[in-house]
């Protein structure tokens, strides 16, 4: 892949996606693996993803192995980093491990609305706010199920892939003060260069103040999950759901 980057200027780090998915399935977010992009000494001009359409439907069959919960965790790991340009794959509408193509797999139909999830949008907005900031990625001394991604002295993203909550008390580059989690709304305090608190199992925390923009939640308009998109009569009654 390094040769492609040198020749073309950038490339997709597909094998890194495999690493990310493996970390999610095992609950092991070892920083040594998640900072190894598989590109040798090449510039990190890479496109990263949790999964692609090939992974979803191909031999990897991620539709049956990687849950939406996993995707949220993996996407936060990708989006919070300085390295790479993350690409989000929108699965088919209402897809599941038992229904690979979902219930409304038609041309022109929107895919799954996971990309509007509050944790996903928080990670995306964090990425924009942290543009240009250096990164410091580490695991706490007693767990590789939790990863901390600091961006300069402005922000911190925390991901817990464990099935148990994790209490932390770690040193941080963030200035002393209070920081609001842009996912839950909870407040965390940095004092004397340390931050402490609890991150729930299988969850994320996004902390920053500088650069935060107050935006309305992403609106969702969708048909009821009972509607399949196929019918053999002259008409069909459809129920719509609106969320904001």
Feature map (PLM): residue ranges:
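Active-site-proximal helices and loops of the catalytic beta/alpha 8
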Residues: 1-213
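Proline-enriched interdomain boundary motifs that mark the N-terminal boundary
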Residues: 215-225
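Short, solvent-exposed loop/linker segments at the N-terminal edge
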Residues: 225-234
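Aromatic/hydrophobic beta-strand junction motif of beta-rich domains
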Residues: 236-243
């Amino acid at each position: 892949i390094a040769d492609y980057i040198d020749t073309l200027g950038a490339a997709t780090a597909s094998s890194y996606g495999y690493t990310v998915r493996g970390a999610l399935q095992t609950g092991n977010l070892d920083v040594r693996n998640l900072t190894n992009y598989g590109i040798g000494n090449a510039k990190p001009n890479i496109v990263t993803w949790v999964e692609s359409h090939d992974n979803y439907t191909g031999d990897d069959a991620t539709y049956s192995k990687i849950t939406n919960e996993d995707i949220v965790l993996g996407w936060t790991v990708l989006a919070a980093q300085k390295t790479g340009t993350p690409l989000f794959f929108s699965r088919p509408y209402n897809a599941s491990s038992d229904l690979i193509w979902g219930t409304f797999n038609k041309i022109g139909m929107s895919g799954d609305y996971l990309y509007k999830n509050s944790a996903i949008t928080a990670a995306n907005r964090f990425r924009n706010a942290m543009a240009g900031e250096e990164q410091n990625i580490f695991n706490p001394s007693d767990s590789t199920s939790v990863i901390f991604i600091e961006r300069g002295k402005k922000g911190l993203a925390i991901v817990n892939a464990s099935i148990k909550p994790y209490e932390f008390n770690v040193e941080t580059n963030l200035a002393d003060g209070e920081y609001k989690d842009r996912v839950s709304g909870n407040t965390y305090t940095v004092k004397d260069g340390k931050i402490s608190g609890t991150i729930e199992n299988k969850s994320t925390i996004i902390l920053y103040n500088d650069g935060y923009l107050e935006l309305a939640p992403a609106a969702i308009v969708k048909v009821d999950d009972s509607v399949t998109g196929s019918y053999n009569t002259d008409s069909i009654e459809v129920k719509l759901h609106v969320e904001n």
